[in-house]
């Protein structure tokens, strides 16, 4: 373990289901630190007992994350090393973590992250959907206004979308996504990742609603949804411009104070034709 004037905060990823997914480095760190801060000590004690780890433990969760962060920082100022763990996965990824990390940096406390399990990445890599660019939304917001705002943003999202959902809200969320993104949008539904009853389903949003009419949702879900096609967006945008008369299209830009020459250039680009074609059409 690295030596610093203060202690260090170690972000330790824990298994999302299969205990064999824990890393040697995380196990060593959990044994060597002075204290483990756990999202739910009742859950984490089972993990530590399984690996015969006797390190003292304290709670760090959503409802004490600020006050407790400063208490833990005080201990690290005294030279204590602390490991942060959650019920499953990587701290800070849809779990407590980001606030204490920010506070540690503000207070000059070193932070390091030990790589490991994360349900979002596990699901994405085996989804069969594009992995180069993705948008991780975690659980959709509970606040109604914010919830709707996120759905509206997803309408034009071209990256692969990752959403977490609980079984009792799954059908409602699939219906909202269907209504927002369209029934033909493809997705991969991952359930109970790394566990005995792990399941992956590839289908459209429309098919997913039919499927869950006869299959009761069980377990925790990760939804991997295809982003919107750029080609499709371009075609829709072009169709929108073409629905305007040429004069209306020109007026759209000229009303913004754009001179006629530049307006013709933009209209030509919008319609996928040459500036000369626009000029000649306007002369008729």
Which positions does each model-derived feature cover?
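Short active-site oxyanion
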Residues: 30-36, 108-112, 160-161
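Class I SAM-dependent methyltransferase SAM-binding "motif I" and its flanking Rossmann-like core
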Residues: 99-157
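Short glycine-rich anion-binding loops that position phosphate/pyrophosphate groups of nucleotides
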Residues: 16-17, 87-91, 167-169, 228-230
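Glycine-rich, flexible N-terminal cofactor/catalytic loop recognition
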Residues: 1-63
């Amino acid at each position: 373990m690295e030596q610093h004037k203060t202690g260090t905060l170690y972000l330790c990823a824990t298994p999302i289901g299969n205990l064999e997914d824990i890393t040697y480095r995380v196990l060593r760190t959990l044994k060597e630190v002075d204290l483990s801060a756990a999202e739910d000590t009742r859950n984490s004690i089972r993990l530590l007992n399984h690996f015969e780890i006797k390190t003292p433990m304290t709670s760090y969760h959503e409802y004490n994350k600020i006050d407790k962060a400063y208490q833990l920082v005080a201990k690290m100022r005294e030279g204590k090393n602390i490991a942060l763990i959650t019920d499953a996965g990587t701290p800070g990824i849809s779990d407590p973590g980001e606030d204490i990390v920010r506070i540690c940096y503000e207070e000059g406390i070193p932070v390091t992250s030990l790589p490991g399990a994360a349900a979002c990445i596990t699901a994405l890599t085996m989804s069969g959907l594009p992995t180069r660019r993705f948008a991780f939304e975690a659980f959709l917001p509970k606040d109604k206004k914010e919830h709707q705002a996120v759905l509206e943003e997803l309408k034009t999202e071209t990256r692969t979308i990752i959403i977490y959902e609980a079984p009792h809200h799954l059908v409602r969320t699939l219906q909202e996504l269907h209504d927002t993104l369209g029934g033909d949008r493809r997705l991969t539904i991952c359930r109970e990742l790394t566990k005995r009853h792990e399941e992956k389903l590839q289908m459209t949003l429309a098919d997913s609603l039919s499927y869950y009419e006869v299959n009761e949702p069980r377990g925790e879900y990760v939804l991997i949804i295809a982003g919107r096609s750029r080609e499709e967006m371009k075609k829709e945008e072009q169709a929108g411009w073409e629905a305007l008369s040429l004069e209306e299209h020109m007026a759209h830009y000229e009303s913004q104070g754009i001179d006629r020459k530049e307006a013709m250039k933009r209209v030509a680009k919008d319609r996928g034709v040459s500036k000369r074609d626009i000029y000649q059409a306007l002369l008729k």
